[in-house]
Every structure is written in C-alpha cells, then in structure tokens.
Amino acid sequence: MSEPRQILVTSALPYANGSIHLGHMLEYIQTDMWVRFQKLRGNQCIYVCADDAHGSAIMLRAEKEGITPEQLIANVQAEHSSDFADFLVDFDNFHSTHSEENRELSSLIYSRLRDAGHIATRSVTQYFDPEKGMFLADRFIKGTCPKCAAEDQYGDNCEKCGATYAPTELKNPKSAISGATPVLRDSQHFFFKLPDFQAMLQQWTRSGTLQDAVANKLAEWLDSGLQEWDISRDAPYFGFEIPGEPGKYFYVWLDAPIGYMASFKNLCARRPELDFDAFWNKDSKAELYHFIGKDIVNFHALFWPAMLEGAGLRKPTAVNVHGYLTVNGAKMSKSRGTFIKARTYLDHLQPEYLRYYYAAKLGRGVDDLDLNLEDFVQKVNSDLVGKVVNIASRCAGFIHKGNDGVMVAGDAAPELTEAFLAAAPGIAEAYEARDFGRAMREIMALADRANAWIADKAPWSLAKQEGKQDEVQAICAQGINLFRQLMIFLKPVLPVLAADAEAFLNVAPLTWSDHLSRLENHKLNPFKPLMSRIEPARVEAMIAASKEDLLAAEGQAQAPVGNGELAKDPLSAEIEFDTFAAVDLRVALIVKAEAVPGADKLLQLTLDIGDEQRNVFSGIKSAYPDPSRLEGRLTMMVANLKPRKMRFGVSEGMVMAAGPGGEEIYLLSPDSGAKPGQRIK
C-alpha cells in the first residue's frame, strides 16, 4: 500500500469587509469536498484559510462605523467563521492576515527579495485627497468620463461607455471619500521586479500546474512582457509597515497570499506533528494546492510563484481555478433577491442541498456555474431524496419488522455488487480531478440501478406472500448494503447525511476502503428520516428575505413616496415632438453576443434589423456575464445614431436598457410578435 500523501490546501481569503454570499461559497464548498475526499482516502490533508484583513477599504469602513479596524475585522471574522462552520466547511485553521505570523513572514519574504535585487524604487504621481490627507486609489476617485462625458464614473473606467483611462484623464475629479477636489502629488513607491521571473513563469505555467484555459490566458500577459508590480502604499493605511521604511506599507495583495503560510504556521504551533518547513522549503515533497476564482489568477499564478521563487521557497503544485456563480442565468442581483448571503440561505434551507447542487454542476474547467433555483429544487428532491435516501427508507422497515433489525448474510445481487465495486475507481478519479459533476453522475447512475433492482424485486409485494420472508430479508439486506456504498461515495459532499447514515447503519465513521466490504448478520439502529424534500415556498421565502437584506442595508423598510426612481434620477427637460421623432427606434434580433477581449464592461452585439446587420458595443456585461444567453432575444435599438469609432471597433447604434448600471441593467424587449426591423413608435 502506498504511503499517505502530505497535502496542504487553501481557498482564497475572503475580504474582511462584508458578508459571505453564495458566490463565495462555491469556492469553499468545492475545496472542502476535495479535502474531505483526500481525508476519506487516508491522506494527510490540511485545509487552511484566513480573512484578508488589510487595505484602505477596511480602514475607511471602520472609521465610518466609529470603531477601530481591529474591532471591525474581529467582528467580520466571527461572522465568517460561523457561516463557514454552518455550511460544513471544515478548515483545519481559519486565521487572519492581521497576525504576527503574517507580519514576520511578509517581512522575511520582502527582505529576501530586496537582498536578491528584486525590489526597485521610483517616484509615482497620484491623486491626493487634501481633506483626508491620503493618496487615493482609482476606485476612490470619481468624475466625468473623458470619452462620453458620463458623470459619476470611477477613476479607471466608465461603466456607461466601457472606456478605460488613467485617473489623471478624468474630468472634474472628486474624492469619493470626502468630496474634495484631489491634487497631484509625487511619492516614492516600491516595486517587485516581476520581469526577473519571466522565463521561470513561462515554464511553470505550462508545467501542468494550471488548467489549459488559464495557462493560455496567462500566456497573453507573458507574451506581451511583464511589468514591475507596485507593492507599496502610503500612510494612512491599515496593514504592515515595510521594514525600515516609515510611512510605507505593504500593498494588501503582497501580504494576502503570504496569509496562507501564516495560517499554516499558526496551526503548526498548536499541532506539533506538523513541520512548517517540510511544507514550504524549496525542496518540499509535500503537495500544495490553491483553489481560487478566475478573477484573481494573475496574483496567484504570476506574482505569487515569482515571490516564492525569489524568496527561495517552494511553489504551488497546482492552482485550481473556477468560474463565477450566476443565479437563474444572470449575475446575482440584489433587487431581484438573487444576491443571497450565506446566512440568509442557512436561515431557510439545509446546507447540504447546496453542497450537492454545486457538486453536481462543478467540472474541472473554469466555466461559470448557474444556480437555477427551479432546477435546484428538482435535482435535490429527485437525486438525494427520491433516489439515495429512498433506498434506505424502502428497505429498513422490512428488516426491523421481519428480522428484529438484523441484516442477513449473503449477496442477493452479485452483478450489482460487482458494478458498484467496479465504479469506485472512476468515481475516485473524478473526485481527484475535481470533476465533481462526473462523480455525481456516476453515483446517481448506481442509485438508479439499485432502485430499479429493488422495484423489480418488490419486497413490499413479497412480504404479503406466504413463505417469502427469507427472500424479502435478502433483498432488503442487499439494498442497505448498496445504500451504504452510495453514502461512502457521497460522504465528501454530504458529511451530515453520511453521519446520520452511519448512526442508522450502526457503524464507525466510514472510510473509502469500506466500500470493499459488506454488512452481514449486522444489527441496524431504528431508521429515522434522513433528508426532507425542498419546499419551493422556502426558496421563495429566501428570495424575499434577500430583498429585505437589501432594504435593511439601505436603511429603509419600504421605499416611501418621493424616494422612488424619479427621485434618484429626475426627468430631463421637456423636448419638442420633432426632436423625439428624429430618433429612429427599431426592433432588433440579437444574432450574436460575445465579450470584448480587454474590456471589463463591454459586450459586442450583432443585431439583425430586418434587411441588414449592425455591430453594437454595449456596456452591459456586468449584468449579463454569459452573453450567449442573449442570443435569439429581441431588443430595442437606436438605429440612426451616428457610428462611433471605439478602441475595439465601430459601434453602429445603441441598445435600450433600464437601470442604474453595474449589475442592475435590464435590457428592454418588445412583446412577442414584434419582428426585427419594425419601427418603435
């Protein structure tokens, strides 16, 4: 038998500035299932995480709430820890980046990089808020877009037209913190010489450490040449001061990944059998895996391995990247009630429902995962209650009534037993590859076979016949053994259901190797219902509660008269009819919709308006993260708008949408029956 593997696993650090939502939970559930599988197989697998507790946003929120940053992050950590525990995410340690371990390790890694010549210094010019006495990050500057003149836009990009620009290009800039007009000032900053590691990163990113799609994306950065990375921020800033540089602080993204090491070091101090150096030294034989979302790939697959290499430490075995979560085919929306906090979900539904649904839909790629709430109800009820738990509930009563709860010996269906044994390696392989969806499909296929076999044997009918009691007991004992096999396979996903099943089965905690054995002449405990169906009304109540969360956050129970959309966005000045008539509005069919490479907000739409097609760029990507879902839909467009040349091509019109922007954008559609090219009047 091979030696148990030594594995250290991390999930991305949640920011200590807000609540956990179901989009976050996708990653932690994915990681937890993989860790539980490794432990079930007998491997030493350590799972650590921490709150990401530094940065200007935390400093400013604490100031707004009238508490210290330390108090804020302690409050948030308590909330996060409770949410994770109740979702059955079983960290070996959940720490904080605001810790002595992280301070020491950040200083150590920085000092090694500096001494090796990988740190540069130079002056940079930035906007400075004279009232707050602080330099402003791009997102803390607002003004008028230099391209389309839209007001109240951020300092790095326009949410209306999708343009990107430098903060110094913004017209009429204002501090989003104080409202003051910022001034330009120079400051010395510290830079990590990422280009020093170009060759290493080109090799490492193609060495099997990343999914192909991720490696291909990073190749674009590598091929265009890496840039030095600004790793410093000026006081006031909540974080760690750079050694020997008063008033200069590490940028949050320098010490955040080091927080993985710090959390593990904190754990090592409490578990003497763990050796920190054995996991982090350059020649470490242990495995190291990071689970992250695709929005932070650059930090984990370029900056982080380069920092580790420069500091003489080991690099990750692999970085496993997942996509975003959508709900009902669209980006999570506060107004629609689909921006669901972890606690709001837990107030209404069992955590294992969502764990199973995520598992059933998670592949090993980076595609987005859609939580379709109607499908969620149907799938959980059908698979877990209707298939898996149904086997135990069908068989247990006959064993208790007919044989005092004792399972008879013998194998009533050798071909089924063999099929379950033969499926185990493939299921294990799918778990190992993080292809949870394939694992669930194979497990449910086995459940279908077991249910079909029991239905064919119909022990409920045999029990009514004279002299058939031995056959009934053999059938039901086989059914319980098959149920036990399924619970072993599902244990990484459904730990509470597995524990309840173990109590019913009257067995010690199941391990993966237990699938090779059977229960014979074995006494069962009385059967209790193991899982109830999801009631659609509870999902509806969760959505309603999520909308109430939004209202509470905005400090309002209901939107009073005079505080509706017109109050937020007053009517424009009156125009003459002829002015309106000059605008040619047409029905348009969206033939093709796709993201624009290099543009965070834009989608490129190909529109059919009857006798011709138009190319239109629209800043609606934030509300429609899966643009393919727009294809085949009718919308409305301004057809006689003068074509406008943009950085990505020529836009030949404008589609009509409502909403304040960001994720709250709603593309307008005509009633059914309208045809492409018809005038809107």
Curated annotation (Swiss-Prot):
Binding site for ATP: K334
Domain tRNA-binding, chain residue ranges per copy: 579-681
Catalytic activity: tRNA(Met) + L-methionine + ATP = L-methionyl-tRNA(Met) + AMP + diphosphate
Pfam families: Anticodon_3, tRNA-synt_1g, tRNA_bind
'HIGH' region (motif): residue ranges: 14-24
Intrachain S-S bonds: none
Taxonomy, superkingdom: Bacteria
Segments crossing the lipid bilayer: none
Keywords, in A-Z order: Aminoacyl-tRNA synthetase, ATP-binding, Cytoplasm, Ligase, Metal-binding, Nucleotide-binding, Protein biosynthesis, RNA-binding, tRNA-binding, Zinc
Segments carrying motif 'KMSKS' region: 331-335
Protein family per UniProt: Belongs to the class-I aminoacyl-tRNA synthetase family. MetG type 1 subfamily.
Assembly behavior: Homodimer.
Protein name: Methionine--tRNA ligase
